[in-house]
Curated annotation (Swiss-Prot):
InterPro entries: ARFGAP/RecO (IPR037278), DNA_rep/recomb_RecO_N (IPR022572), NA-bd_OB-fold (IPR012340), RecO (IPR003717), RecO_C (IPR042242). GO terms for biological process: DNA recombination; double-strand break repair. Transmembrane segments: none annotated. Belongs to the RecO family. HAMAP family: RecO. This is DNA repair protein RecO. One of its GO terms (cellular component) is bacterial nucleoid. It comes from Beijerinckia indica subsp. indica (strain ATCC 9039 / DSM 1715 / NCIMB 8712). Involved in DNA repair and RecF pathway recombination. It holds the Pfam family RecO_N. SUPFAM superfamilies: ArfGap/RecO-like zinc finger, Nucleic acid-binding proteins. Keywords: DNA damage, DNA recombination, DNA repair. It comes from the Bacteria.
């Protein structure tokens, strides 16, 4: 068995004296593990850090085996990530979220989103918005996507400012007003056509409150887990670094 693919390193742990088990995320083969001989040695370890991108070749006698990974780094992100607390915690959060995916299950569209996100992780005005949208995409990819297309009560497609915490469907301002305290806020940047607006910090935090509710209810909670520590750390960095007046997002 053999495959070749590009991808992102999301985890590394020692195996034996100098070997390493590498966890990667690729477009065609999803989240995948493989043994890298000498991967924990002095020469390779620095190249195999989470966030770095590479071309991978995986080989095994049988498909269900761990297999061997050959790694050809294509883009090293370690220095850039460690220079920014926001970027470092963002990468840790991305890795934690990707571990919700079944092993070897391809998610090419999600991989494309991650590639864009990595390019902006150290940008305080952009990274939180993109990461919140990534969490929204994770819910969709795992079968728990929200329906933000129309009001659950009236069918209206305008003034959608709430989401039902039970159904995951959008609710309009008028229909949701009597239940304001029981509904989750829906920030404009989660809706199509609103990417050019400048979200406030409060809107960004509302976005993470929304995705966090459903991530906990549908994904982390059933596994007996809590939301990742990296998520709390990323939100703390966001609160410190997010500009009061954000530049144009895309």
């Amino acid at each position: 068995m053999e495959w070749h693919d590009e991808g992102l390193i999301i985890g590394l742990r020692r195996y034996g004296e100098t070997g390493a088990i590498l966890e990667v995320f690729t477009p065609a083969h999803g989240r995948h593990f493989g043994l890298v001989r000498g991967g924990f040695g002095r020469r390779l370890r620095a190249l195999l850090q989470p966030g770095n991108q590479a071309d991978f070749t995986w080989r095994a006698r049988l498909d269900q085996q761990l297999g061997l990974l050959a790694v050809e780094p294509t883009k090293l992100m370690t220095t850039r990530l460690f220079a920014s607390g926001l970027a470092l915690q963002g990468m840790n959060l991305i890795a934690a979220l990707l571990r919700l995916l079944p092993e070897r299950d391809p998610h090419p569209e999600l991989y494309a989103v991650v590639r864009v996100l990595l390019e902006h992780l150290d940008e305080p005005a952009v990274a939180p918005i993109l990461l919140a949208r990534f969490e929204l995409a994770m819910l969709t990819e795992t079968g728990f996507g929200l329906d933000l297309s129309a009001c659950a009560a009236t069918g209206a497609t305008q003034e959608l400012i709430y989401v039902s915490p039970k159904s995951g469907r959008a609710v309009s301002a008028r229909a949701g007003a009597p239940y304001h305290d029981k509904l989750l806020g829906l920030p404009p940047f989660f809706l199509d056509g609103s990417l050019l607006k400048n979200p406030t910090l409060e809107e960004v935090e509302a976005g993470f409150a929304l995705t966090g509710h459903f991530l906990m209810r549908d994904l982390f909670g059933p596994r007996g887990q809590t939301l990742p520590d990296a998520r709390h750390a990323f939100l703390a960095e966001t609160a410190k670094t997010y500009p009061r007046v954000a530049p144009q997002c895309f």
